[in-house]
Amino acid sequence: MLTVRATRPSDLAACLDIVHGRYAFSDGDERAALAYWNHLLESRAGLSRVLTTLAGPDEGRILVFALCVFVTDDFMREALTTLPPHLGLQAVRRWRSGKRVHLALREIARDNAGDGLNLLTLAYGTAPGLPRDVDLQARAMMAAAGRDMFSGYRIKNLVQEGLGTELHADLLATGVKVLRSFPTHAPVDPCRRNGPPTHVYGLNRDGRPEDLGPHWWMFFNPPEPRLGLSEAEKETLERALENETDDDMARSLGISIWTVKKRWQNVYSKVEQVAPALLSAVGNADETGGASGFERRRHLLAYVRQHLEEIRPREVLRR
């Protein structure tokens, strides 16, 4: 049994073991990678998922790790033109030297409401030696998780690097293009002078809509959010989608259970103003419990799963 969940800081050492060697990390690079990845998770600037086992002798083992980040225009421009292979390694080294690589949360909100975002897969790895059927299931589940991670953001460039033949056929089959290629014997890194052929894959918003296809079009052209939620209300819904209870939220956020309940009441009030039909079929019980309260929440979360733009960071533009 396998499941996909949000990556936790405590997962990162195991995640590094999975990708070790793919990016020619030195010992110093490894320490910097752990620090950088932890910073991205703690600051909510990174999007990350792990696929783990749910049962059996390896219960809890991480089989797949993915970490994505919204990078600056300058870093994306270099990634597509002049940076050497191993973009995840180059990002770690840039960050370690004090240079800007990624956008902070407030900048993500600004660009998500404006010109759009540059999404780069910073690290991706699969545990070696997986049986063929497990490997295929894991890849399918992570692809679905990726759609959930990216949906609702206004993306202008989407880029992922692949080494050798790993994921090559999968990516091309979805319509992703090869943007750069490095030959087999390119001097990829001082730590490892020769390596497998490397490709940089991606899509950008400037192409023709028909070139994107239905699989990708919504990532570049998300609907406008309608509910007008505050950042605190968005966080409440996001955590609920991750199956956190109200008590879980109160503990993890360091707020009272009353504050959590108040957030839900504010959300319902906004929904009733904008889309009253969404909740009218399940009554008006308050959120303190009961069948109607449970059904109202279930209906609301079902809507949000289909409209993740409602909970993405987004600056309110002044007109």
Language-model region placement:
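Active-site rim helix/loop that mediates acceptor-substrate recognition in acyltransferases
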Residues: 27-59, 67
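Conserved GNAT-family N-acetyltransferase fold
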Residues: 64-68, 124
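Short helix-to-turn junction characteristic of helix-turn-helix DNA-binding domains
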Residues: 237-244, 304
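Recognition helix of helix-turn-helix DNA-binding domains
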Residues: 245-295
